[in-house]
Amino acid sequence: LLLSGPNGIGKSTLLESLAKGTAKGAKIMEGIRVGYYRQDFSTLNFEDSVRESLTKVLKEVTGKIDEEYMRSLAANFLITGDIINTKIGDLSEGQKGLVAFARLVLERPGLLILDEPTNHINFRHLPVIARALDQYEGAMILVSHVSEFVEQIRIDERLELDK
């Protein structure tokens, strides 16, 4: 679902309430894992290294740590060996975004909620993100004002919010 509308209408507020399960009149079914990408990266712990952040998610989801899988997935998001041991707080905004996306893939959510996922991402990295989202097989709610990005992703439904 592509959610669109003018700035200030409450798209981010709606997404957050859906992700937190506090939206009036909407309930996510019990047992559905929700992945939430916030444009302010507040889902990341800036004190963790990239490795620690990815490892925590992997251990939470699978109960084990598969270093080879984690590194392979990280590489798909341009997270290289020199970045993996860096504290998240020391990364550029674009690198934080790539870490947030790698975490989402590791989480294997049934519902993916994305609030302006192209913000802070280097334009050269957008195809990497678009490809990952296009291959995603669960439900997705996306807010993005970047039409060139959205065109690269399979969108089944569109909802325009207006006052």
Task: State each model region's role.
Residues L1-K163:
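ABC ATP-binding cassette signature C-motif
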